[in-house]
Every structure is written in structure tokens, then in C-alpha cells.
From Swiss-Prot:
PANTHER family: SERINE/THREONINE-PROTEIN KINASE, SERINE_THREONINE-PROTEIN KINASE GREATWALL. Pfam families: Pkinase (PF00069). Residues 359-462 form the AGC-kinase C-terminal domain. The keyword Transferase applies. Its EC number is 2.7.11.1. Residues 414-439 have a biased composition (Low complexity). This is Probable serine/threonine-protein kinase DDB_G0286841. It comes from Dictyostelium discoideum. Residues 414-447 are annotated as: Disordered. ATP binds at I70, S71, K72, G73, G74, F75, G76, K77, V78, K93.
């Protein structure tokens, strides 16, 4: 059992040296939580048109000071912000309506809100409130200052210790068990979406691609920014109305081939993550492992085709370094079985839990969250040092421009009060066109505002 005490160093220090000196008698002191696996909480019935929100007080944009960009994804950006009144630090996910409508992902945004609003547990990031303006949608969520697993992996120079890997993977399995028991398939599981809270526990985030209880769903679905057109691997012809959801590295072959998929998609992604943690890079890349860890461009269709070809031609033969234990290799190979019907986890989570890789795991204490990844130590509530900045976030001028534009847009527009106030909407569009010269307010975004009158975003409106 890999148990860590609260003396774990900050990212500013060397993780590798610390873990090499851990003694077997280390213990932790963390609060005990009721196991949601053994005792399932009551939840509201789910529906596509659910209108309840998780906060009785709707929080308008003007209530927050936006501090910096935490991350950027296919749907939008996540900002670190502070409530002006309560001084509470939160993470605010901002989504452009124009992108959502163009990509026909309105239902997916509503599904994400439904999941975050109705499932309150220790394994999912908490949603405080949600609202919309004429151009954007906002999720006000808890800020998890322990960072994400992508940052954690990079802090180890892409060589995470096996004991720590086992600890994290076990916590992810408990999270997936909770989701699958409630009929939720995440569909975008990757290190960036696996967060660490202030108590050192794993929480899953970003449910923008999630679905409820689907089996063999049609592949005639739309796409996010960093997802790519489905193609026939035999003739490389694209099919315009067939799209793939997800991030290229983590997509299973049945999705690429349009064969339909179910909960085993999450187990495939877990196998990719396990490989990445232990070896330092995903198993299917456009370059050889020694040449490049990350793709030259996530949006380079040629590179994505190479990745997809490798995934669909996968025959259980992967590169493994000699240092890797056979039991870890066996787990990876079974999670990455190209046949989803025999893939580990196809018959339920117990298949995964019973694998010899987890022979020393006491699942009960993981369900009760008695095991930490590590104990974050932060200087203040706004400390983001556990998040390693991505390249696109390093430009401070760009970050300031983004935040200034977000606030400027809010101040310049007279936010409409209801969907029937058409004249006010048109006036707001004119004000925005005259006052905002930022790339955020491009022609597509301005031209699509009138369509919002006919789009049912399940968000409180201002």
C-alpha cells in the first residue's frame, strides 16, 4: 500500500528524490468520507430539459475578479477568479456560444451541466452555479489547487514511480465506478481532466463529452475543436457527417472505425493513461517514442491520421521498456484490447479491481478516500503553482488581453433579461461590434447571436 504523509514537498522541489526516501511506516491523517460506492446517494431523475441548478443564488459575472487562465480546451477556457464579496476562489469555465452552436454541441453542454448539478460526490468537481450572457456560458466551479495529473507527470520528467501510479489509477477506478454505476460514461478521460483537490484526492472534471447510458450509439455525431473527422482506414476517405469525440491519443479503435461503443471506452482511456504514467508518453503517436513525446500539433490532421492508423492497426503489440514489471504490462495489454467485448472492464469494474496489479490494494480505504496522492501545500487560495503552464498559457500579455476582453465584453453589453427581448439583443450586438476588437468577438460569434433566441441553453439567463 502506497500511503503518503503530509510532508510531501511542493512542485518547486524535486518529487523524485522525495519518493525515493519514503519509509514504509508513513501514515496520513485525512477526513473520512462515506463510501458512495457502498452507499449510493439519492439523485434527481435525469432528463435533457432539466432546469434546476446547484445553487439557490445565481452568480452574475460582475461578482468576480478574473485573475488568470488556468487551462484551455476544446470548448473554451477555465479562469481562476475570486468572488468580490465572499473572497472565495473559484474556477470559472467560459464557453463561447458561437463555437457550441457551430459544432452542434448544445446538447453536450446541457448534459455537462446536468451531471455537475445532479451528482454531488467526492469524485466529481463541484459546480457552485451556472449562468449565461448573450455570447457566453459560465460554469462556476470549485478550484482544485492540487493541480492535474498532466502537471504531476511532467513534474517527474514523464517518469512517474509505479507505486504512485498505482495509487492514482486506483483512485481513478473508484471515480469511474461511481460514474458507471450511475450510467455516466466520461468519454474524455485524460491526465488533464484528472484533478487533485486540497486533501490530495482525485476528482474528475470536464464532462463536455459525457453521455448517459448509451450502447452502440451511432457515430453520426459532431466534433470538438481537438477531435477529428472519422475516416475509412482502408481508403483514407473522410465522411463529412461522421465525427469523432475525444482527444486523439485516448480514442479507442471502435470509435475511430464507427462501430459504436459503451463504457469500455473509459477503460481503454485508463489503459492509455497507465501506459503514459509509467513510460512517459502515450503508446500511439505520430512519431517514434524517442523522437517526440507530444504531437507537433493537435490540430494537424496528417498527424492525427497517423495516430488513428496506429490505434486501428493495434494488435496488442506495444513497446514496453525492460524495467516495467510483467504484471503492469499485462494490465495495460488487457485494458488496450482492441476488441471492446473482451477488454478488461467489459463485464464490470470488478474485473479491473481483481487484476494482480492491484493485489496489494485495499479497495475499501480507497472508497473511503483514506489514501492521498499527496498533500498540497499552497501559499494562498490563489496559488496555481501545482498547475504547470502549457505553452499557450505562457504569454502573460495574451492572458491579460483575454481577461480584459472578458470583462470589457461584460461591461459593454446590456445583458438581455429574457429570450423575448429581441430589440435589446440587436442593440447589444451593435455595441459589441463597435466596442470590441478582440479575436473573441469574431464575425461568426456576432452573426450567431440572433440564433440564441432559438437555442435552448439550459442556463439561467442575464
Amino acid at each position: 500500500m502506497f500511503i503518503i504523509n503530509k510532508n510531501l514537498p511542493h512542485f518547486k522541489n524535486d518529487f523524485s528524490d522525495y519518493y525515493s526516501k519514503l519509509d514504509n511506516d508513513l501514515s496520513i491523517s485525512s477526513p473520512k468520507f462515506e463510501s458512495p460506492v457502498l452507499s449510493q446517494p439519492k439523485v434527481k431523475p435525469l432528463s435533457h430539459d432539466i432546469i434546476s441548478i446547484c445553487s439557490t443564488k445565481i452568480t452574475p459575472l460582475d461578482d468576480f475578479n478574473f485573475l488568470k487562465v488556468i487551462s484551455k480546451g476544446g470548448f473554451g477556457k477555465v479562469y481562476l477568479a475570486e468572488n468580490k464579496i465572499t473572497k472565495k476562489t473559484v474556477a470559472i469555465k467560459v464557453i463561447k456560444k458561437s463555437d457550441t452552436i457551430k459544432k452542434m454541441m448544445v446538447d453536450q453542454v446541457n448534459i455537462e451541466k446536468t451531471i455537475l448539478s445532479n451528482y454531488k460526490c467526492n469524485f466529481i468537481v463541484e459546480l457552485f452555479s451556472s449562468f449565461q450572457t448573450d455570447k457566453k456560458l459560465f460554469f462556476v466551479m470549485e478550484f482544485l489547487n492540487g493541480g492535474d495529473c498532466a502537471s504531476l507527470l511532467r513534474s517527474f520528467n514523464n517518469n512517474m514511480p509505479e507505486d504512485l501510479t498505482k495509487n492514482i489509477i486506483a483512485q481513478i477506478i473508484i471515480c469511474l465506478e461511481y460514474l458507471h454505476n450511475h450510467g455516466i460514461i466520461h468519454r474524455d478521460l485524460k491526465p488533464d481532466n484528472i484533478l487533485i483537490d486540497s486533501n490530495g484526492h482525485i476528482k474528475l472534471a470536464d464532462f463536455g463529452l459525457s453521455k448517459f447510458d448509451f450502447v452502440d450509439e451511432s457515430c453520426n455525431i459532431k466534433i470538438l475543436k481537438n477531435s477529428f473527422t472519422l475516416y475509412n482506414t482502408n481508403n483514407n476517405n473522410t465522411t463529412e457527417n461522421q465525427k469523432i469525440l475525444g482527444t486523439p491519443y485516448y480514442i479507442p479503435p471502435e470509435v475511430i472505425l464507427g462501430k459504436g461503443y459503451g463504457k469500455t471506452i473509459d477503460w481503454w482511456s485508463l489503459g492509455i493513461i497507465l501506459y503514459e504514467f509509467l513510460i512517459g508518453y502515450p503508446p500511439f503517436q505520430e512519431d517514434e517514442p524517442n523522437e517526440s513525446i507530444n504531437p507537433k500539433s493537435d490540430n494537424d490532421e496528417k498527424n492525427v491520421r497517423i495516430i488513428f492508423n496506429k490505434i486501428t492497426n493495434h494488435k496488442k503489440k506495444l513497446y514496453f521498456p525492460k524495467k516495467l514489471y510483467p504484471v503492469a504490462i499485462d494490465l495495460i495489454e488487457k485494458l488496450l484490447d482492441p476488441n471492446p467485448s473482451v477488454r478488461l472492464g467489459a463485464n464490470g469494474v470488478d474485473e479491473v479491481k481483481c487484476h494482480p496489479f492491484f493485489s496489494e490494494i485495499n479497495w475499501k480505504i480507497y472508497e473511503d478516500q483514506k489514501v492521498l496522492v499527496f498533500q498540497p501545500f499552497v501559499e494562498n487560495d490563489c496559488d496555481t503553482s501545482y498547475f504547470i503552464e502549457r505553452k499557450e498559457e505562457n504569454n502573460k500579455n495574451k492572458i491579460n488581453d483575454d481577461i480584459d476582453s472578458l470583462i470589457l465584453n461584460q461591461n459593454n453589453q446590456n445583458i438581455y433579461k429574457n429570450n423575448n427581448n429581441n430589440n435589446n439583443n440587436n442593440n447589444n450586438n451593435n455595441n459589441n461590434n463597435n466596442n470590441n476588437n478582440n479575436n473573441d468577438d469574431n464575425d461568426d460569434e456576432n452573426n450567431i447571436i440572433d440564433q440564441n433566441l432559438f437555442i435552448d441553453f439550459d442556463f439561467p439567463t442575464y
